[in-house]
């Protein structure tokens, strides 16, 4: 569940009324596992931006970053925007988050999530993290770089990852990162 300007009890009750099973997740008092739905966009709390699906391991990144209110944060490789939205939520309507990604398609995914969230201190921008812009030097209070990933962090949910990875793909990924 989002925290800023969202009543968790209302979000949870709404999901349960729709037949969604809601169970507390470990580590964070606002993290929940949800199941028992057929189509996530039909879940009212998702549609209204009260919740943002994200793996708990990804949510812990926002906790570790712990942005101060009023901060300017840049999230590189941000699609689909879960970590960026989490940072914006933690800023409690202050500061701003610039969610970047390399392709316009990914930026549009981020924008869809921003629009649904209703948060106004976040925007998406197409920008390649490999190209240094002198205007970016020493302007951000926080830079989140979840560089192009292997997906190993969520392998428990996406077991096909281990079958698609090859030694050559791993070597290429290491060089890119």
Q: What do these predicted ranges mean?
A:
Residues 1-177:
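S-adenosylmethionine
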């Amino acid at each position: 569940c989002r925290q800023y300007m969202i009543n968790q009890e209302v979000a949870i009750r709404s999901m349960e009324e729709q037949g969604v099973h809601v169970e507390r997740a470990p580590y964070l008092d606002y993290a929940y596992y949800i199941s028992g739905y057929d189509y996530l966009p039909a879940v009212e709390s998702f549609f209204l931006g009260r919740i943002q699906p994200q793996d708990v391991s990804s949510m812990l990144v926002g906790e570790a970053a712990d942005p101060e209110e009023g901060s300017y944060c840049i999230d590189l490789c941000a699609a689909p925007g879960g970590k960026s939205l989490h940072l914006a939520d933690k800023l409690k309507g202050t500061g701003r988050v610039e969610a970047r990604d390399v392709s316009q398609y990914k930026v549009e995914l981020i924008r869809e999530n921003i629009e649904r969230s209703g948060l106004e201190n976040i925007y998406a921008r197409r920008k390649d993290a490999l190209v240094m812009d002198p205007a970016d030097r020493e302007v951000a209070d926080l830079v989140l770089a979840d560089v192009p990933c292997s997906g190993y962090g969520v392998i428990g949910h996406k077991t096909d990852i281990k079958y698609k990875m090859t030694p050559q793909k791993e070597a290429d990924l290491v060089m890119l990162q």
